[in-house]
């Protein structure tokens, strides 16, 4: 891959792009940060956030962290309107049992079906609670499942998660052991676990091919390839 051409106002790495050298750390240069062809447009000081956030259209959804996000004025996942990027603003919060439990690396969007989903991960590992939202109106997400996953737990564990490309399945992956669950959301009002398995000693990080037929999931020492 060729080196990026960084224009005026940029602060790129002086050596290998993407690498913070020992020289930069020792000299204090790394404290200034790095940027290439990026400039700040606006900012918002909210209630803090969790590990992973998600975006759809002009909206951003800030992941929650348990228990801290439960003691702020608007608990749960913050909904941010960034239609005016110079002045983004909080327009609501998602405060169901899953979103308040800490979303860790599970808060994801499927653009094809206009869905937002997450599981409850209080600290590194969790499970049971799962929420699916319709984000057709991105500023006003609408909770679709009020029974399984919200009022009653589902039988899965999770640390991270994500949609299949078609948006009809949500995959929940527990960090240890390598526990993987497929949650059918073809009818998002009634999510149900349709498959579970152990793929390795642990799991952290997965991706899928665009056709949804293959999953690549880490196992701590390498990658497992699953036919999905």
Where are the regions a protein language model picked out?
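Feature marking well-ordered beta-strand scaffolds used for ligand recognition
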Residues: 1-228
């Amino acid at each position: 891959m060729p080196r990026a051409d960084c224009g005026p106002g940029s602060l790129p790495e002086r050596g290998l792009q993407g690498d913070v050298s020992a020289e930069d750390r020792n000299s204090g240069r790394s404290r200034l940060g790095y940027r290439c062809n990026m400039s700040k447009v606006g900012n918002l000081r909210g209630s803090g956030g969790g590990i992973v956030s998600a975006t759809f259209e002009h909206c951003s959804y800030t992941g929650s962290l348990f228990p801290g996000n439960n003691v702020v004025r608007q608990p749960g996942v913050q909904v941010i309107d960034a239609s005016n990027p110079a002045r983004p603003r909080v327009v609501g919060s998602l405060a169901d049992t899953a979103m308040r439990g800490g979303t860790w690396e599970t808060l994801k969007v499927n653009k094809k079906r206009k869905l937002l989903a997450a599981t409850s991960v209080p600290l590194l590992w969790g499970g049971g609670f799962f929420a699916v939202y319709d984000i057709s109106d991105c500023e006003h997400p609408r909770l679709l499942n009020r029974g399984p996953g919200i009022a009653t737990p589902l039988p899965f564990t999770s640390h991270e998660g994500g949609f299949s490309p078609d948006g009809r399945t949500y995959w929940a992956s527990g960090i240890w052991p390598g526990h993987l669950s497929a949650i059918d959301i073809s009818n998002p009002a009634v999510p149900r676990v349709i498959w579970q398995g152990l793929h390795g000693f642990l799991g952290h990080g997965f991706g899928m091919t665009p056709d949804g037929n293959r999953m690549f999931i880490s196992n701590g020492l390498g990658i497992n390839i699953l036919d999905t």
